[in-house]
């Protein structure tokens, strides 16, 4: 297993405390934000070389140690489609279960849901999309048909007391359709919420969104679904992830998805690399005086560990500025 080198300068300790400067506008933001760390699943699923199971387990444990309240651990998808996630059961069983930390797993179908439950999953996630063409190309059915396929999962989850999180892809743009109507995003989000998803993450899958587009989309969705049930999942393909996240914060959204070291993208959307780096998100939120419960120093150590294991450079600007990776 790769080992962590001591690459984090101690001067970062003072930086990481980020004595938040209060501003007159802070009152417009939530006082606390829940960060959903998607690196171990969304971040690693597209890596060409198979990441050893012990490395995945250590990464998840380090992220938990850093104080992240939610760490999406893996995906119970067919190894034929995503070979990187073939060790899903071993990962879920092998990680330390930190008190107060949730470890949701992606379940694309009922077979995956059953396997996840057998491995000890307490929360699962399902995926929808706001683009008909994206849905057709990925799973060869319509949006409505795709949601109907999840009905069995939601019913079984309800009976077993398992929480279900929903994802909506392509909320600000599609690689095939282009611009997506905010009304369509609102429609799909409302359906997932009415089906029983306690939280719906709105994903800018190809990272084309701007703050204006984010505002328009959320304005439509908030007419159908309470803000407490929403999260945003921004990609930094065009360098807009933090700006879009800030816009969502201003509109009351208090759950943010991000990936350590900015790992990951979407395997079906060409050029859609670059999830929002968790390190950069934590740095911004700390500067706004918004509580996350995340220790930036330990988070940076987790990012350094996985980047060294993958033999790659971090995509986090904060890590680049302080760790020299």
Curated annotation (Swiss-Prot):
Pathway: Metabolic intermediate metabolism; (S)-3-hydroxy-3-methylglutaryl-CoA degradation; acetoacetate from (S)-3-hydroxy-3-methylglutaryl-CoA: step 1/1. Residues 33-300 form the Pyruvate carboxyltransferase domain. Keywords: Acetylation, Disulfide bond, Lipid metabolism, Lyase, Metal-binding, Mitochondrion, Peroxisome, Transit peptide. The modification N6-acetyllysine is found at residues 48, 111, 137, 179, 324. The modification N6-succinyllysine is found at residues 48, 137, 179. Mitochondrial 3-hydroxy-3-methylglutaryl-CoA lyase that catalyzes a cation-dependent cleavage of (S)-3-hydroxy-3-methylglutaryl-CoA into acetyl-CoA and acetoacetate, a key step in ketogenesis. Terminal step in leucine catabolism. Ketone bodies (beta-hydroxybutyrate, acetoacetate and acetone) are essential as an alternative source of energy to glucose, as lipid precursors and as regulators of metabolism. PANTHER family: HYDROXYMETHYLGLUTARYL-COA LYASE (PTHR42738), HYDROXYMETHYLGLUTARYL-COA LYASE, MITOCHONDRIAL (PTHR42738:SF1). Belongs to the HMG-CoA lyase family. This is Hydroxymethylglutaryl-CoA lyase, mitochondrial. It comes from Bos taurus. The lineage of its organism: Eukaryota, Metazoa, Chordata, Craniata, Vertebrata. The gene is HMGCL.
